[in-house]
Amino acid sequence: MELDEVIQGIVSAIGGFDYSDDEKVYVLGDEALACLKDLKRYLQVVDEKYKVWQIRSLLSSLQLVTNDICPILSDWDKDITNYRNWRIALACVELLVPLTWPLETEHETFRENVDVLYNLRQAQSNYKNSILSYKKGSVLSAILAVLLKPLSTPAESRTLRDKGIIRIVLLLFRNILQIDELKTKNETIISFAKAHILDLIVTLVSNLDEFEHFDVYILEIVYNLIRGCKPSALFSDASLTNSQTELNSLLLKESTQNRYLKRNAHTRHNRFGTMLSVQTEDRRFTIASQNIKTDGLDELDSHKRFRKRGTRRKHFDDINKSFFINTEAGTALRNFAVEFLEAGFNPLFQSLLKDLEREDPRVLPIHKMQLLYVQSFFLEFMRFSSKPKKTEEIYSNDYSFGLAASVFDQRALIMHNRLMVESFEMKQWSTFQASMLSMTQLLFTLRSMTLCSSEIYQRIADNLLSNIFYQEEILLLVYSALKHFKTQSFGYLDAITELTIVLLKELEKFSSAKQYLYVKKRRRNQKSVDSNVLESDEDEESSLINANAAVEDRLFDFGRYESRYCDNGCIDSFVLFLQCYQDLDSKQIHRAISFFYRIFVKQKCHVYLYRLDFLRVLDKMFNDHVYFSTTNSARQDFEQFFVYYMRKLSDALKDVPALFIELPFPKLTDTFYYLEYGKSPLFSIHGSRKGPLYETVPGLSHLEKVAAVVACLINENKSDLLDELKVQLNCLISERKLITLADENKYINEGGNDGERMGKNLKGDTDSFNTALLKDGKFRLLLELCGFEESDNNIDVQALWKLPNSVIIDELVEHAMLLRRFTDDPPTFEGTKPEDLLVRKQRGNVRLPSSSEGETSDEEIEFEADDPITFANRREALNKITDRKRKKMKTNETIIDHTTRKKKENHLRSAKYIVDSDDDSETDIAFFQSEAALREKNAQKASALFKRIDDLEMEGKLQEIEQLSENSSSD
């Protein structure tokens, strides 16, 4: 027997209507309970086991719910003492749960399921309509009566079966809410309110200690009830005329649009008198309209057929789907939300927070999203429900913040931040969107707490804001989410733009109120290890700990953080958001304008907004008087920004004509300075930015040095640098030959400029070559071997190396021939690697003295830097001797560092007093002769002193050495 025949026989045996009776009462069959159990078993064995929807499809075609289940539940007398009738009603509820379960398709869904998907969804809509409206909602009352029996049992006496009945009834309520959610949300809320199901939910959450295992199902019901409803709509002053107000606004917008269209519409006569014809290679375009006289190009564009290129976009579930709520449903939902907030929000939130902390398997990823969304809704609802009436004299911010006290717990904030970071990293965009909504409402609530009259609430708000802004990870996460917006939903874009503006405002206020604001920054701290020292096990463990992510406190600079948003990605997101201005309200438009104001006016990043798409959006909004009319409250702020923007753009185009070419393209960091100021930036080359210094081992000839360096560069795959250097040398040789042919003396004395007399700068044609001039130590050594000199120019990289005039043309030709020889035939070294012939120089620490250092100090006498008998040199010699005797004393390191610093200071001081003067030449000659004699005398004393010190050292007389050093220093 076929399966459909079996199912049809079972359904027929359940019962049917008695048409002989005037009331047509439904009569149960003798085996009605057994038949209902058989249908449940078939659903489990066939549909759930094999993941097909065959039984569901058969039951929908037989209209089991409409013709059998609803009449059975409706005609039941709700007498829970009659076990047989109650058991039949329970069997009907057990069948309704799988039949109303949400239908979801996956990548591996069977083709047969996809074919019947539309019919099953239509059948579920009929199921919901029957359950809600059959005999004025008597079915919902019967379902609630089924639940009364396990609820009336004391908590300690409830069995697993009782808990299972509570669970399936709650799941049935959840399923009914999810079917045709947007279309029938108002009817569902009204039916649930009349059947006292909303009161049941409030009762369960207020006694959650007895029903702690059902917190997840209660969360799902509450989420589906409030999803898409704005709390502001529930507290509208004209709640009774909401539909009328919305209808009037739509009619006014339609009349304005019709009036605007009629003004520019075609008539019978405006097609005569003017014609434009354009002949192309393949066809002719002809337009007859009088608008060609003034708006010819626009008229041509209006006749184009734009074929928008299809893009494959990912569609994510928008959790904040809005719907219009009527008066009756709004009143019922508002009353439920008020009771839920007063009685059950804190217990439900604390219970779910515990489940998340212990990672309860009942909590699924979708429940995390629902919890965050419910939190954001009730935080906003709390401000509206507790908001006092606004009068002309006083306006208070004293809300009942205790209604949501569980949200202000430190544990809740930690969990929220964790969910926010995890959802972004795992690309769970719905959960991340809910976390952004929750963070936005939390910041709004904390702002209200700081403005209230209670000092306790003010301290709580200040503490929470400090904890939120202390996490730099969250601040950077918001910036990264805005920057990398791609194909998420519009609700996601709305949430991230709102959070960005609110976060910047609150962070600016908080940082300005605090003298110092620190944030926690994660960094990697790698421990330096000496290769010559063997570490113990403890050292290895400490190195592993130091290699992990370390945390440090860093002083927060709001201006620097705000400047991060001067980025093409962030601006792209807000431009895309503003392009939908026809669907935005005044607050959303004002939000976008305020962001552009921060970028353009406060941060003065004008160039980033000089974009053709942004200019097009502003122009379209300025000329649109239908969807962005003068009655819009954001129109005035927009016009002020638009006028200021156009004035700055006009001035920039006059000053930097290259901006005309850059308008259609995103701006790069390299060209930002030039487009902003019309000139190239000047970058200072700090000593730490330069690469390491190398030198060859002693004993090599010039030919061997060049061969070793070239071989090292070839082994490092840097032949392109050598090729470009050969090209540069050939160019320099050609220039020198031209100078020689053009009478070099005349060129130097008359025609040459200062830069060419000083030498020719080495300029690279590629970025890699210019980087090597600064960073590559081996390549810099090769330049020195080729006769180039490194200048003291710390502004431009291309002026860092130059070829002096002392290098003759024959030397240049020789260097070019050597490079060509070694690159064509790379040199080899028998038994030695070319890298072993190069050693790295030790670069000392550079300390720049302050302006007040060394100018008025009379403690020490200034000596010349090359004087062998300075105090620093004598002290250094003594330190070398004592270092041999006291290797383990740490004071030696301090003395050496001190003497090194003093030696550098003496060098700077003596160099400072060298004055270039040509007036006292005879005096200078006598002075230099006396100084030379003094240096010779001091050198003799030094040699005698060091000889005496060596003799005493051999005898081991350390005290006499120190006494001798002190006497020599006093001399």
Curated annotation (Swiss-Prot):
Pfam families: TIMELESS (PF04821). The modification Phosphoserine is found at residues 528, 536, 970. Its main location: nucleus. It is found in: Nucleus. GO terms for biological process: DNA repair; DNA replication checkpoint signaling; gene conversion at mating-type locus; replication fork arrest; replication fork arrest at mating type locus; replication fork processing. Fork protection complex (FPC) consisting of swi1 and swi3 interacts with mat1 cis-acting sequences and mat1-proximal polar-terminator of replication (RTS1). This is Mating-type switching protein swi1.
